Design a protein with these regions (language model features):
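Charged interaction segments
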Residues: 22, 30-142
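Short, extreme N-terminal segment that most often corresponds to the first beta-strand
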Residues: 1-27
């Protein structure tokens, strides 16, 4: 399941395609996807039978009302947005791992942390899945 709702203050066909590739579906009809300056991503409502992770176009004014402690405003930073939107608790695919200095994006269902510790010389500092706070800090100036 996706675990971090967030939004970005841009809405392009290329960005929507990247969201589809990581598992999100549009909440809007395809002819309405270009409407709105922001894209919001959320996990669907688990109480609904036909619920799914979705992205939805929004206007900037609407995005200003989200609770920043719950939904992260990525500004126009696409790398941060995609890193946060990819956070899941059921797979390591597209997840960022770090030891605080070295960063690696995982393309495997389950990260091989022992191998990464040896291969990248992470040494005594153990590599781990990056936290939301670490991702925000790492991608803030990208």
């Amino acid at each position: 399941m996706f675990i971090q709702p967030c939004f970005i203050r841009k809405n392009t066909p290329e960005l929507r395609e990247k969201l589809r590739k990581i598992g999100y579906r549009s909440m809007n009809r395809s002819d309405k996807e270009d409407e709105g300056e922001c894209l919001l991503v959320c996990e669907g409502d688990e109480d609904l039978i036909d619920s799914y992770p979705f992205y939805a176009p929004r206007d900037n004014k609407c995005c200003n009302y989200y609770d920043q402690s719950q939904v992260i405003d990525c500004g126009t930073n696409e790398e941060l947005f995609l890193a946060l939107a990819s956070l899941r608790d059921d797979t390591d695919v597209n997840q960022w791992f770090t030891n605080g200095n070295t960063w690696k994006n995982c393309m495997l269902h389950k990260a091989d942390l022992d191998s990464w510790n040896r291969e990248f010389g992470f040494g005594t500092t153990v590599v781990h899945k990056a936290t939301v706070k670490e991702l925000v800090e790492h991608f803030k100036d990208v």
